[in-house]
Amino acid sequence: MRWPWSGHDEEKKRNAATRSKRAETANSWTGTLLESRTLVPSVALTVSTVLGLRLYKAYFRRIPTVNHIKPDYFRRRTLFGQVTSVGDADNFRLYHTPGGRLAGWGWLPWKTVPTKREALVKQTVGPVLILWRLRPRRISSDWMLKAIQLHIRIAGVDAPELAHWGREAQPYSKEALDWLTQLILHQRVRVRLYRRDQYDRVVAQVYYRRWFFRQDVGLEMLKMGLATVYEAKSGAEFGDVEQQYRAAEEKAKESRAGMWAKPNLLQRLGGAGTKAPESPREYKSRHTAAEKQKKAAW
């Protein structure tokens, strides 16, 4: 004969057994997770994933434009890339290739640097398709090219000005442009970032490799007499090479290199004087003053 309360006692025993089984299962899972054979690989995977993401963001993520450069990169970081075009004797377009050949640039099919305008434009069709549909007349191929390249202004130097905006070309402006184009166009260079200027260009010191030696593009231009030291009252950037730049300019003047050469007989007969050539800064100041006088006269 069963006792009246025997069913209640059995139910308590079953509940207690269930709780005990659950506790054993939880302890078993905890023990398994805390075992070295499980814990060590889990921690290693987590740490490697976090470090990999940080490494990618810091060194292997492509920076297409100046808007993607973090403020703390200036004066601290360098970027490696390929020159896609040279627009003037002291500035050019750079396609950032983080990691260089070690990261696959130049030999992996999906990591090729476009060298033609059409190929550069195609890279931006996807990102700007919506904008093009909204503003079809405002999205030009020039705008698309700017969306995937960095506009670099060589720091510390000022090259002779080409003809533009109705202004005449300075002597040796074409020679300076041809020299720079031959030196760096479609070549890989490294740029040390200094700042962003008012034209959304990156003012940077530019280096290229000649065999195993690193050469400073700005310094070489000064030695060749194809540029002057940058003399604007504001915005000059030299890093730690200002004295080296000024010494190179003085040496070029003494040796009559490039723009510092004395005019030959034909040039003198054509009206060229023997006074010192007009520097790019003097050229800009002269035209700016003339334009102000013209506006004041109106």
Swiss-Prot record:
GO CC terms, sorted: membrane; mitochondrion
The cross-references to SUPFAM superfamilies, in alphabetical order and at most eight, read:
Staphylococcal nuclease
User: Transmembrane among the record's keywords?
Assistant: yes
Q: What is its EC number?
A: 3.1.-.-
User: Where's it mainly located?
Assistant: mitochondrion
Localization annotation:
Mitochondrion; Membrane
Origin superkingdom? Eukaryota
Transmembrane stretches in the record are 39-56
Decide whether keyword Hydrolase is in the record. Answer: yes
Give the compositionally biased regions (Basic and acidic residues): 278-298
Membrane-topology descriptor: Single-pass membrane protein
Residues forming the TNase-like domain are 77-262
Sites binding Ca(2+) sit at D158
In terms of Pfam families, this protein maps to: SNase (PF00565)
Question: Region (Disordered): which ranges?
Answer: 1-24, 269-298
| Residues at the active site | R153, E161, R201
What GO MF annotations does this protein's record show? endonuclease activity; metal ion binding
List UniProt keywords, sorted A-Z: Calcium, Endonuclease, Hydrolase, Membrane, Metal-binding, Mitochondrion, Nuclease, Transmembrane, Transmembrane helix
So what family is this one in?
Belongs to the LCL3 family.
**What name does the UniProt record give this protein?**
Probable endonuclease LCL3
Instruction: Give the originating organism.
Output: Leptosphaeria maculans (strain JN3 / isolate v23.1.3 / race Av1-4-5-6-7-8)
